[in-house]
Amino acid sequence: AEPGRMTSDATVPSSTYRLQIRGRFPLSAAAELADYLQALGVSAIYLSPILQATSGSDHGYDITSHRQVDPERGGEQGRLALAATARELGLQTVVDIVPNHMGVADAAQNETWWQLLRDGPDSQYAAWFDVDWKAGDGRIKLPVLGDDASDDQLSLDVTGPSAELRYFEHRFPIAEGTVKPGDGAADVHARQHYQLIGYRRADDEQNYRRFFAVTELAGIRVEDPAVFDASHAEILRWVAAGDVQGIRIDHPDGLADPAGYLDRLAAAAPDCWITVEKITEPGERLPAGWPVAGTTGYDALAEVNTLLYDPAAEAEVSRRYAELTGDRRTWADHVEQGKRMVADTILHAEILRITRAVRHAQPVLPHSDEDVAQALTELAVGFGVYRSYHPIGAEQLDAAAELAASRRPELRGAITNLLPLLSDAGTEISIRFEQATGAIMAKGVEDTAYYRYNRAVGLNEVGGDPGGFGSTPAEFHAAQLQRQQLLPESMTTLSTHDTKRSEDVRARLAVLAELGERWYGTAERLLAAAPIPSRAFGYLLWQSFAGAGWISSDRMHAYAEKAMREAAEGTGWRDPDAGFEAAVHRAVDRAYDDAEIHSLLDELITEITPDGWSNSLSQKLVQLAMPGVPDVYQGSELYDYSLVDPDNRRPVDFELRRQLLAGFDGPPPLEATGAAKLWLTSRVLRERREHPERFTSYTPLPVTGPAAEHAVAFDRGGAVAVATRLPVGLRRAGGWRDTGLELPAGRYVDQLTGEQHSGRARLADLLRRYPVAFLTRTD
């Protein structure tokens, strides 16, 4: 079966609402919120991971036990109460699960990891983790020691029931029979199945697979049936009890065999609506045969986001970026540099592990280990998508080989000899290379290049293509016709816990691309008034103010610190540069305290805000009405101006939303509370839940007249969406004038205003009150 159509009797939700479950918002809080979500029009509550995680974890992706619901998140009692409430209200539940890794920040909290460290390769949990014991001389390397650390900072604790090694607050187990009278901590450490090493040594010596480069998240081997069963028994118990109807798979690209994993999961949960957090590059499709409904929606986000940009503006935006910042590198240059940086540093251990596997498989290969490692690095750097799934994606490997050989002709021989090994599906070499390319792409591009190439940062979004620009309504329609045919049950989204910016920040950033000299002149003055050693980073900072507006200075300082360290040009996480960082923080302070800079920014923010509202409502309507299952990220039914995590995981004021929704007695005005966005969201979600038959097809509706390019309109089979795009250009050109569209046969009512329409509708009338219209057929 093609992905996108569930082969089972899965109950596909009409929409989902994502909640971040944690200590300060446990499952009981979700249960209390359920009636509001039901009133909003949602059909499924979509939960972040709820299995036991590292104590205090705000996100829950660092699972320490698969056996139970996290007590901090409300425990089994909280889960059952939420399940009962959801059932009572007719709501489904979707859970987020993490098959790729476990949290090992504190070994004492993770029984499987503790026993692995204590008993080594003979541990009953040795098959759980992906450890290269040979590379560590039979020991697992734990890069937890500080810069100046040595064995003499370790201490021996024999006060408990079993002896432990201590390094400050870190605790480690001791193998039986390895403590002799008079031993110091260093003597005991030398006899363990693990070796504590300085954190900087991880780049070369790390010998267990991690989630990306996060030492505290150890990869697990769900490809082993026993590990799959043990790590999924609890989740499948919820499914069997009828408490869970949907599953979201975190990071499938980390798995050794994603297709095999998904087959096993779909067989164990045949009635579940399954989506995968898979990021596809432009033009890339989900692998055929995956038994899933689709992705978690980053592909849809990109289709909607680019609609807010005018392809005709790209040349000017690029030219002015180069002039303002002095950065004349292309997006492709930034991708190459970002990927090479991480492949040579934080993910180099993965390259070395594949190199060892190559040497083991082909001892007589006529290339040095150094050449093999460099050839593997070049192939990974040149890989055009996150990963292949051999034999699917074989052409990606060939293309990467061509590119790699053209960049490093002296490695052509090694590259050519590696190709048969890398394309031999199911072998250790092939699998590890596929796992590595995804990590190198994520860290080198999303977490590095996205912070360096700052031409129009609203396009630097997960699933997006910062090197592309806008798209036309015709291109959008083509993508939706394909989506309706191939992925009608895939999730769609505009904001997640992983997006670089919330949808409403991006809506305002899109306005900057329309402003032309009004924006570039302001940016020039800001860059001059508060100098930062990197003008490209300064340009990112001032765009961030324009997009987020006057958020608290604490939030902006925290964002600036994360962004400049991710960019790793001038400062970084490992070796922060005090001078560079002080200059950036000074610029942030001056935005709030310096009268000239503050008023420059304030005038800009005030000017773009109404057009930002227009873009916010347009993209929301398009996302909620387009083919797929729309997700609403917690709180984003009102305007929410959030930056990258942890900023986008702040507590949500649900009481405000509840009161606004209950208090509606008609269409609210367009203003700063965002009530209009809540009104729009609730009208469309309720319609999708109550009249699914009106959302079964996709027909582009041609807009004609002088401002035709400023609208996008489509009919889903009885529900019609009409949205404004490029509002600045529309106003400058004199408004809608006699632009209009021919409604499909029948009589329609705009669910947002209550107005009746039929036949040819003039957009000046249709969009008089709001920049959007949502019409349903009444006859």
Where are the regions that the model predicts?
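Hydrophobic or amphipathic alpha-helical targeting/insertion segments
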Residues: L82-F129
